[in-house]
Regions:
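Long, highly charged low-complexity segments
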Residues: 1-17, 55-56
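Residues at beta-strand starts and edge strands
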Residues: 3-5, 25, 185
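Structural beta-strand/beta-sheet cores of well-ordered domains, especially the beta-sheet scaffolds
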Residues: 5, 27-29, 194
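Conserved catalytic palm subdomain of right-hand nucleotidyl-transferase polymerases, strongest
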Residues: 6-7, 91-94, 198
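Active-site-proximal helix-loop-helix substrate-binding element of RNase H-like nuclease domains
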Residues: 15, 24-168, 180-181, 188
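Non-catalytic accessory segments adjacent to catalytic cores
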Residues: 168-171, 175
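Extended, well-ordered alpha-helical scaffold/bundle regions in very large, multi-domain proteins
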Residues: 176-198
Length: 198
């Protein structure tokens, strides 16, 4: 039986949240599965987070399919904080939309994808009232940040359900190609994270 888990992280914003910049921090991790929605304060505050990372690791490793939007970004962040994280399979909704749109839009945004499917759009408050004004993630009130992240995760999950149906009802070769590209994404994430000895 498939156990799907939807993931989203929120980070500090230096270089667009670059996970390879030591200046950045992982602020929150949000997860959604059949057990419901959970969010975890990692470095949003200064509270200890080791136990939370262990819980996240257990939840992620128990899933058979990890869903996200531009999921390689989220995986880089999890790998930075969690050693030896085992991910069985991923579904990148951004990659799926690129394939389903016949590669006409290489980097569709979550908001554009939500709008395309007639779903509730992202909450603009965090971007417009905080990030665009130079206010970093740790300075955003928790209730606003938590609501923003939850809406992103719920929206990503809704997009996944629509995309899955579209793939299942469409050309099976396209679906197989997408699954293969998701496997490739995991390998690419590993290569980018580990680097190369030259």
């Amino acid at each position: 039986m498939q156990h799907t888990l939807t993931l989203d992280v929120e980070t500090t914003t230096f270089q667009k949240g670059n996970p390879f910049s030591r200046r950045n921090r992982l602020c929150t991790v949000g997860l959604l599965d059949d057990a419901g929605y959970r969010d975890f304060d990692i470095e949003y505050t200064n509270t200890p987070y080791g136990g939370k990372l262990q819980t996240i690791k257990e939840i992620v490793e128990a899933s058979t399919l990890l869903i996200g939007f531009n999921i390689k970004f989220d995986l880089h962040w999890l790998r930075r904080y969690i050693d030896e994280l085992s991910v069985h399979a991923v579904w990148d909704c951004q990659l799926a939309e690129f394939i389903l749109a016949q590669q006409s839009n290489p980097y569709p945004s979550l908001n554009d994808t939500l709008n395309l499917y007639g779903l509730e759009h992202k909450l603009d408050t965090v971007k417009l009232e905080y990030w665009d004004r130079g206010i970093d993630t740790t300075e955003i009130p928790w209730d606003i940040l938590a609501e923003y992240q939850k809406r992103d995760i719920v929206g990503t999950r809704e997009v996944f359900e629509i995309q899955k149906k579209r793939f299942e009802e469409g050309d099976p070769r396209l679906y197989e190609m997408f699954k293969l590209q998701c496997k490739d994404l995991l390998i690419l994430q590993e290569m980018e994270f580990e680097g190369m000895v030259l």
